[in-house]
Amino acid sequence: MQIHSTHVCFGGQLSYASHDSTATSCEMRFSIFLPPQATVEKRPVLWWLSGLTCTEDNFTSKAGAYRLAAELGLIIVAPDTSPRGDKVPDDEAYDMGQGAGFYLDATQSPWSKHFRMYSYITAELPALIAAEFPVNPDAQGIAGHSMGGHGAITIGLKNPEMYKSVSALSPIVNPLDCPWGQKAFSAYLGEDKASWAEYDACELMQAAGDRSTYPAILIDQGDADAFLEEQLKPQNFVKACEAVGQQVNLRMQPGYDHGFFFVSTFIEDHLRHHAAVLC
């Protein structure tokens, strides 16, 4: 692992780092915020997954999360959204290839060698962070925005013993039923719809059995989001949650769109949501 830069931030420490990944067969980058409390004890960690076209820097520089994270004592890790590099396959479209990893393990050529973001996020990166930084592995939460909201919910549902709290802003919750998901899943996973269901929040929730004892999932969604009706469809997820007893708090926010002004407005609510479970 290489630390590229470190900055004092609200009494804590924000670092940008990279390492050679075996999961994605390329260099991967991430940012990590350590609150002041991490100098004396292991602290809970919140994994933040960003959306289409983003890198590790978008949330880090735009969300305004670190003042409250320092107060609450939350470590925040923000990885890149995909493998990158000259040898990594790409696509001219913004919603495929580099910057559009969709937090799955691709099975189709030419994507399968590098696009293994599910394994990277759930296994390799947590092991690295636990070895190098003062995280409490028994207190982990996961959150994200848009494509990252899809990643946060699906990863949280598939690994409930690891991620104790889940939240999302403007998440893609039903990729089997939206153009972004259908395009990406066709390319990365092929035409076997059963494999698609493994990365669809609605499908996973419906198959989860009784979820009545799990903490509530917080979702914020702007009602002026240009992608709301065609791509995001949060009501589909609410119905899936109701069917298995999962508490979900979907908050429709009047006038807000899909961007980081929206994220920065509500990020503190999400940090408090996770801290209530983890801290």
Explain the meaning of each model-derived region:
Residues 1-279:
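Non-catalytic cap/lid and distal C-terminal segments of serine-dependent acyl enzymes
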